[in-house]
Regions:
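Short, surface-exposed beta-strand-loop junctions and turns on beta-sheet-rich folds
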Residues: 26-28, 35-36, 126-127
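N-terminal strand-loop-strand
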Residues: 1-30
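Unchanged
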Residues: 34-124
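Short acidic/polar alpha-helix capping motifs at helix-coil junctions
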Residues: 8-13, 37-38, 149
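Residue-level signal for alpha-helical context at structural boundaries
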Residues: 28, 62, 66, 77, ...
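Charged phosphate-binding loop/patch that engages nucleotide di/tri-phosphates or the phosphate backbone
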Residues: 119-150
Length: 150
């Protein structure tokens, strides 16, 4: 029987930029496991804050996104990770210096403009492409973009 792991994460936006973390050599979005009886929204905000240094008070959940499921096999054990994703807006100072959580294998954090996404996505898993495609075509995100300058 497979172990079931629940996680939550966020696709963080600031103007027309999206936040990525480089974890174990690949670009992805911040996420982490739910602790027992933990709230998914609070977990997503906590993980974003821990992995990037952004303050939770400067993060605002806009809407939930689709969940994803990953199947992993290690040492003969199968695990299924279900991640609940949220679209999150960064409302803090744009000049805030991101602080990657090195102990988690995160070597870098960066804001990527929409026109530079292709370069970043060259070194990311298909799941990241899938989530990004979903977000970029989401009506809520398109409405958000209409009110942004850069």
């Amino acid at each position: 029987m497979a172990d079931k792991i629940k996680a939550a994460g966020g696709i963080v936006i600031r103007g027309k930029k999206i936040l990525f973390i480089k974890k174990n050599g690949r670009w992805e979005f911040p996420k982490g496991r739910l602790k027992k009886r933990a709230n998914k929204k609070k977990t997503a905000l906590r993980e974003i804050s821990e992995e990037t240094g952004l303050k939770k008070k400067d993060l605002e959940i806009i809407q939930p996104l689709i969940p994803t499921h990953n199947h992993n096999k290690a040492n003969g054990n199968i695990s299924i990770k279900e991640t609940t994703w949220f679209l999150v807006k960064f409302t803090g100072d744009p000049s805030f210096k991101l602080k990657p959580e090195k102990r988690e294998g995160i070597s870098k954090c960066k804001w990527v403009t929409l026109n530079k996404l292709e370069i970043t996505l060259k070194n990311s898993r298909p799941l990241v492409h899938y989530l990004l495609g979903f977000v970029l075509n989401d009506p809520g995100y398109k409405d958000y973009l209409k009110n942004q300058r850069k």
